[in-house]
UniProtKB/Swiss-Prot annotation:
Organism: Schizosaccharomyces pombe (strain 972 / ATCC 24843)
Task of the protein: Has a role in the negative regulation of gluconeogenesis. Required for vacuolar catabolite degradation of fructose-1,6-bisphosphatase (FBPase).
Keywords associated with the record: Cytoplasm, Phosphoprotein
Classification via InterPro entries: Quino_amine_DH_bsu, Vid27, VID27_C, Vid27_N, Vid27_PH, WD40/YVTN_repeat-like_dom_sf
Recorded family membership: Belongs to the VID27 family.
Name under which the protein is recorded: Vacuolar import and degradation protein 27
Phosphoserine, modified sites: 405, 415
Main localisation: cytoplasm
Organism lineage string: Eukaryota, Fungi, Dikarya, Ascomycota, Taphrinomycotina
Composition bias, Acidic residues: 372-384, 396-423
Compartments where found: Cytoplasm
Modification sites for Phosphothreonine: 478
Length: 801
């Protein structure tokens, strides 16, 4: 608790600052005898000096997100800030951990037992929580004894610290009546880890009891599991504790992966959702006689709602990670809408850990519409035009399948020259036990760069369908000889340089001269600002001599200029935000507009650094791991683990119709509805052997080029390379994707610059150039058949590159 006391001079040193220490994000609650009220859902806590000697204040200040409208008619600024004189009469209580803190204190305005509580969970840098507690105790010591805290012993400070004692009875905060079923073990839900709980309940409750239904289930199991694992009979759910959120009747169908159709299992089942507490939710399908399945509500369900067919499709994974695709069909749109809100409420609360009913109607509609099987993104066309589009789409797919039937990928070849052979031999020998991890495609020099441990392989693009190993940049290291392994990579300065970051140096960027083949600079960004990610100043900046780039920390955006003396962060172009935004990725348009995504799942659109976002799009729940944007800024791609979002940023109506969301904000009820790209639950059921272990999409990308139109989106998941036709996606055909399966997981992929026909694909031990026409519609054949490899004269199929 007091391990940071020796740092007191550093913490207290700046007497010109009123603020001594701060926790930048958390929530403030008012705790009463029978309920707990959230006062500020986003807040910061700080300890400030006052003008009086030995007097300090604990200050809780509300924070606003960009795009959040403040109530102008209140006129009460005091509501946005609560301050308390740090005195022992507050009876401060602390619960401090490495990365979290909870503080409780008496409400000085009431004597009825009302308390305040400030909580920040699992998001602080190590030491911040302990520092805050120590400073608070030192302030109370100074007030009581009217002398400097430097004279205090640890025992002197401990008298002001009290532990937090929770009431034995949980407070029910305006929730529905809890429905409890009989328990075999009352503590089962609380004591088991969620993964273990999933497996145990899945084993007991997934499959049917009736003898007549066993052949069908065994047939499905044999499709997805060649070992023909024996299916055990199950009993009804005998124990489940939780709040019954709702139950809806429907038909139940199971996907047959051999026939590629859904087969009716039961004409009348009850689909129920339970709230188990602690943001855990449970989904069951049952009748009076049996329980069909029981599973946790999470993103791996891959939920798809089709209002055209009044159906809901999702995935269930058993204890052995075998995937099953199930379908519920409803008898009316009303019932389906009721079920959708029921399930989406549970899923959203699970991912966001806040109450669905506390967000506004517009945000709830935004979330639910994103999970619909899509309509058109653009203005509707007439019926005849739509019919012709469908016919054209079908004909084009058939033509592409015919073209793809005999296609073989062109894997990288090595050169004949003596010097090149030496490079190849050294590369293969030194890198034989390592695997590819990162890919960067050149815009100007027609080359691709592939990272493998502390080496970078350079591959030249040959003709339209070939790659040729050119050289290896070996033994990446600092001037002092410290080995470096890139974790993020970017080409820079007309493709003459590579900038990269390593995981163990979050405050630095390394600058490599490609021609020289050595690291020439280490750029210290800032001692107190860790670099989460970085991106070019604009879409095509790497083709120019532009020196600056854009950097992100968890809650700030700034410019990096290597020409600045000392730290490379430009102080005049640094914007820090009050709340914990948890930024994760960024991309820029041709004009330098910036799209920024976060691990919370929200997206912000900026026209420049140093201002609040023009548009803030709500989070769906999953963390965003990558973002891309078209050169014009019309469309943004945001990649999550189980789906990809396509967002049209063009404002469609009103005063700013025709402008971009980067330039003007959308009306509150007119925010763009994302198109949700994902694998269909049916295809996941057929791919399940390859997607075991929680496979994730790689960051999706548009094709790009000077004056080129973006027409295609590419990503991958596990061993499957996947592409979407952008025009078809805009017209609502989000399930119209093409795939190509490899015999190893795809590590990274991107388009060759200036074309949408050629793709560069990095596998663990190979690099290939792929013709887009080789990707095929997902069928049992295309899903189960890996790509044939063309062996080079050096027979490098299983060797590095």
């Amino acid at each position: 608790m007091f391990m940071l006391k020796s740092l007191g001079k550093y913490i207290w040193g700046n007497t010109n600052s009123t603020e001594i220490v701060q926790i930048p994000y958390g929530q403030l609650y008012s705790v009463h005898e029978n309920y707990r009220e959230c006062m500020f859902k986003d807040a910061s806590a700080s300890i400030r000096r006052t003008t009086a000697e030995f007097q300090y204040q604990l200050v809780i200040q509300r924070a606003y997100e960009e795009g959040e409208e403040e109530l102008e008619d209140d006129g009460d600024e005091a509501e946005d800030e609560q301050s308390f004189l740090l005195d022992e009469k507050l009876h401060l209580r602390f619960d401090v951990n490495k990365d979290s803190i909870t503080i409780m204190w008496d409400n000085p305005d009431f004597q009825d037992g009302t308390l305040y509580e400030f909580t920040c969970e699992n998001c602080l840098q190590e030491g911040v929580a302990y520092t805050f507690e120590m400073v608070a105790l030192q302030c109370m010591y100074e007030r009581k004894y009217r002398q400097s805290h430097e004279k205090a012993t640890l025992a002197d400070l401990e008298q002001f610290s009290n532990p937090i004692t929770r009431p034995s009875k949980e407070v029910d905060s305006l929730e529905n009546i809890v429905t409890k079923l009989d328990l075999e073990s009352e503590d089962l839900m609380r004591l088991k880890k969620q993964e273990q709980l999933d497996d145990e309940i899945a084993k007991k409750y997934l499959l049917g009891q009736q003898e007549a239904e066993e052949p069908l289930v065994q047939q499905q199991t044999s499709i997805v599991n060649p070992e023909k694992e024996e299916v055990t009979k199950t009993e009804n759910i005998k124990s489940l504790e939780g709040e019954l959120m709702g139950t809806i009747s429907a038909e139940l169908h199971l996907f047959d992966a051999v026939e590629e159709v859904f087969i009716l299992q039961d004409p009348n089942v009850e689909a129920s959702v339970f709230d188990l507490g602690d943001w855990n939710y449970w989904f069951t399908i049952s009748t009076e006689e049996k329980t069909w399945l029981s599973q946790s509500v999470d993103a791996d369900m891959n939920p798809v709602f089709s209002f055209e067919h009044l159906s809901f499709i999702w995935n269930y994974f058993d204890a052995n990670s075998n995937a099953f695709s199930w379908l519920l069909r409803f008898d009316s749109q009303v019932r389906m809408e009721q079920f959708q809100e029921l399930l989406m409420r549970a899923l959203w609360e699970s991912l966001n850990q806040q109450r669905w009913l506390k967000i506004d109607d517009e945000q709830r509609d935004y979330v639910m519409e994103t999970f619909h099987e899509d309509e058109e993104l653009e203005d509707s066309e007439d019926e005849e035009f739509a019919r012709q589009q469908l016919l054209s789409r079908k004909e084009e797919e058939e033509e592409e399948d015919e073209e793809a039937s005999d296609f073989e990928d062109s894997f990288a070849d090595f050169s004949d020259g003596e010097a090149d052979d030496l490079d190849e031999s050294r590369w293969r020998k030194e890198a034989a036990k390592e695997h590819n991890s990162l890919l960067a495609v050149g815009y100007k020099n027609d080359r691709s760069y592939v990272v493998r441990n502390n080496k970078i392989g350079v591959f030249k693009h040959v003709d339209e369908k070939g790659l040729k190993f050119q050289t290896a940049l070996n033994n990446l290291s600092t001037p002092k000889g410290k080995s470096l392994r890139p974790s993020k990579l970017m080409l820079h300065n007309q493709d003459s340089s590579i900038l990269f970051q390593t995981e163990n140096a979050p405050h630095s960027l390394y600058h490599m001269d490609i021609e020289y083949g050595k690291i020439v600079d280490e750029w210290k960004v800032h001692d107190d600002v860790p670099l989460v990610t970085f991106t070019p100043d604009n879409k095509f900046a790497q083709m120019t001599a532009e020196q600056t780039l854009i950097g992100l920390s968890n809650n700030s955006i700034f410019r990096i200029d290597p020409r600045v003396e000392g730290n490379k962060l430009v102080a005049e172009q640094f914007k820090q935000y009050a709340t914990k935004n948890d930024f994760s990725s960024a991309a820029t348009t041709e004009n330098g507009y910036i799209a920024v995504a976060s691990n919370k799942g929200d997206i912000r659109l900026f026209d420049r650094i140093g201002v609040n976002a023009k548009t803030a799009l709500p989070a769906l729940g999953e963390a965003i791991i990558g973002v891309d944007v078209t050169a014009s800024g019309d469309f943004v791609l945001a990649t999550c683990k189980t789906y990809i979002l396509l967002i049209d940023t063009r404002i469609k109506e009103g005063r700013y119709a025709g402008r971009l969301g980067f330039e003007r904000n959308f009306a509150k009820d007119k925010k763009p509805k994302p198109k949700r790209l994902q694998l269909s639950p049916q295809h996941i059921a057929m791919m399940q052997r390859e997607l075991k272990g929680g496979a994730s999409f790689t960051p999706a990308k548009f094709n790009t080029g000077i004056d080129a139109k973006e027409t295609t989106i590419v990503s991958s998941i596990g061993p499957f390379l996947i592409s979407w036709n952008l025009d078809r996606v805009k017209r609502g055909f989000t399930d119209s994707y093409k795939i190509r399966r490899y015999d190893a997981n795809v590590q990274a992929e991107d388009f060759r610059f200036g074309t949408d026909r050629s793709l560069i694909v990095a596998l663990p031990d190979d690099v290939a150039m792929v013709d887009k026409s080789s990707l095929r519609r997902p069928t049992r054949e295309s899903i189960c058949t890996p790509v044939k490899k063309l062996r080079s004269k050096h027979d490098i199929v299983n060797a590095p590159y």
